[in-house]
Structure formats: C-alpha cells, structure tokens
Amino acid sequence: MPPLHKQLTIVVGIIELDNRFLILRRVDEVPLWHHKWELPGGKIEAGEIPADALRREVFEETGLQIGEPQLLGIHTHHWNLPELTQQTFLIAYKASAKSDGVTLCPEENDAFQWVTLDEFLSISDHLEANKDMIAALYAPLQKA
C-alpha cells in the first residue's frame, strides 16, 4: 500500500423515495471512479455543517430538495491510488426526497437509478466505499 498522503471528509446521502434510494453514475477523470455508481454527496465546504453540505450537494447534483437528514454514522475507506493512499471519512445520512424529478449535473453524473438495497448490493460497478458504508450502516437498519 502506498503511503498515506491525503485525507478527505465527505458527506453522502441515502436519499429515499417509495422504498428505494437514489444512486448516480459518476463522471470522473480518475479511471478508478469513472462510470461507477455512487450515492449523492461530496466535500464539505469551510464553515459548513455536514447536514447542510448534504442538502447543497444533493441539490447541485440532482436538483432535488430533501427532508431533514438523519445521521447514520461515519465510515472510513482507504483508496489505494497508484501514487498514494487516500483515507476518506464518509459522514453518512439518510433523508427523504421531496420529489422524484432528478435533473443531473452532467459534469458530475451521467445517469441515475432508484434502487432497493438488494439491487444496489448486486451492482458490480459501484464505488467500493459506498457499498461498504451501506453494508455497515444502512443494511442493518433495513433488517431490523
């Protein structure tokens, strides 16, 4: 594993509607992440509260308004990139979408789906960090 050179904290949201949640297909110059399915979310800006960052990121990426985000927890993932290892902290929330009218930001994503938990877990081309986080923090809630 290359040495740890970068640490990043992001918010991600499991945005629910009608017993499904929203996933987006990423457009990225990094091949490891390009055309991988992911949850809406992104970087927290300076001075921003994580729940507000989630609202902003979801709106920027999808045009959706969401209800009050509920904190699921924090998950850590290490990305082994060719030149470094990036440690990413994912602050995970779930929230309800106020509508299903998704308008994608084409610079960030080129497709979306509303999926069940089982459908998401069966997708092979997803961001590993999202799948690990969902398995750790969200899936146990669905089985309770």
Residues covered by each model-derived region:
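A generic structural micro-feature
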Residues: 3-7, 33-36, 83-89, 106
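Conserved N-terminal beta-strand and adjoining loop/helix that marks the start
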Residues: 1-22, 43, 90, 94
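Unchanged
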Residues: 44-67, 77-129
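Residues that recognize and position ribonucleotide moieties
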Residues: 14, 37, 113
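Local beta-strand/beta-hairpin segments that build beta-sheet-rich folds
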Residues: 72-73
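Charged phosphate-binding loop/patch that engages nucleotide di/tri-phosphates or the phosphate backbone
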Residues: 129-144
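A generic membrane alpha-helix/interface feature
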Residues: 36, 43, 81, 134-136
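Conserved Nudix-box catalytic region and its N-terminal flanking loop in Nudix hydrolases
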Residues: 20-60
